[in-house]
């Protein structure tokens, strides 16, 4: 039975939820067929597998200035005319014309490509399931926006406010038309049931074929964090830094035996280093680039404690974060250090 999946990301780019889903759908004799945006990333190349994928490329320019201009043009076209969704729907329609499909699944972290999925589900009279991995309301501020507009501060606020309104309007319209909605945490379920009562919880989970306990002897006590920090409002390491500073002050640890290892991107490293300036912890920290997702189980199993960062739940704080990293960390059986977490 064929299922058409529209999603904003899919392996080899970051996209574990849909990547793992397709892996196990095929084993259950379903036939997932994917339409997704072309993204230059190979973090999850091992999850591509044999799933047929149509990659829709929206960005073609080379060079920093041309890329910026192209991004602005695409943003404007998409804002006013649903450019990306229309192009995605066109690619999906070609597939639907070629064969029989039992339904459509659309997975998004924000809104795109929900309007495309809504359109083709109505056009071809197919049931629509929407899966929301993240939603705008969960963020403490504007972390859901990948690019800063960098105009005047007052204009930035106006653009952001208008953009947020459009994202929510388009998302909620699609939710109301969906036959089923799935999402990642109890908080998300409660929030989304206001738009579609048929909203169910499907945790991110982990792949037991990759993540399981292993025994490794190490010469150092290692606290490990893998992932991204998009802001201190969402993930705050300062409570950890305060604790390490106290242990250092009381001479209970030393850098030869105690390490904090960060597997993060350059933007996350900058946030961490800025947060650490008020604490004498730099000599305890090591930074590594992202590693392929297939190597993460080994990194976790060679650690002493796995760090999970969050921030205090509040009306203006982060809400409902239950990432794949949390479940993968639990799967390897290591102790978890949770900083200011509320889920």
Language model feature labels by segment:
Residues 257, 262-264, 269-298:
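Nucleotide-activated donor-binding/catalytic signature segment of Leloir-type glycosyltransferases, i.e.
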Residues 179, 300-319:
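Acidic donor-binding loop of glycosyltransferase active sites
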Residues 342-343:
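Conserved small/polar residues in nucleotide/adenosyl-binding loops
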Residues 86, 90, 112, 119-123, ...:
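Membrane-proximal helix-turn-helix segments that form the acceptor-binding/catalytic region
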Residues 8, 63-76, 99, 129-168, ...:
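Acceptor-binding helix/loop patch of EC 2.4 sugar-transfer enzymes
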Residues 187, 205:
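Carbohydrate-associated surface elements
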Residues 1-58, 180:
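N-terminal subdomain of nucleotide-sugar transferases
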Residues 215-237, 241-244:
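Conserved donor-binding/catalytic core segment of Leloir-type glycosyltransferases
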